[in-house]
């Protein structure tokens, strides 16, 4: 048990087919002269390498279940999912087809697929060596609005980058995490795109760890034609242990949600 200001975080490790962390987060909220102790569950699951369609279907099930339980006043669990995907491109609701630079036959040749999905944002790439994180959260549990939530995701990644000695930050009017964002050398290391309904979220962030960046050359990443992409591996000059990045990201997300 760890005491963090007015927050108590209980941590336990469960060994299953998937690696799962279970956090019970207790928050003290002052109402008048009384204090109410609210307890909520936050489960962190590692799906490892999983095809995009399967992950999308599964997180949609969890998202729908959380929305239903919230509306019915029933118990529910907040989730943070970690995974990697085989080569895939996803186009968000506001995305433009012209930002996909390959046709169907060319996509098959490079072993990739394209999905039109229900998150915000334009087109992005997911593939081996990229850490994808899908938080499925009731934002009201954490006193967050949608803009604050996106800012929190960015902040978690900025802190992870800093832990590796990389200075990262934000770029005005461009969601995600960037290096040298206000210079001609601006390059994106993490894309963010979310969906929210009834203050429940799905989709999330994609952090380039040991990603094959050549796959970004087949798109205009997030709709940009004048900015680059990078990875932890490219910036550091060596491969980065994925498990280490997962642990650091989980730590930062839990600390910020707390």
What is the role of each PLM region?
Residues 178, 195, 213-258:
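C-terminal accessory segment of soluble enzyme catalytic cores
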Residues 200-208:
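Conserved phosphate/anionic-ligand binding catalytic regions in large, soluble enzymes, centered on
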Residues 189-192:
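Histidine/acidic-rich helix-loop-helix segments that form or flank divalent-metal centers
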Residues 3, 7, 14, 22-24:
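Short hydrophobic targeting helices and cationic amphipathic motifs
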Residues 166-171, 202-203, 215-219:
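Short conserved catalytic/interaction loops centered on acidic-Pro-aromatic/His motifs
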Residues 39-186, 239-240:
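N-terminal lobe of the biotin/lipoate ligase/transferase fold
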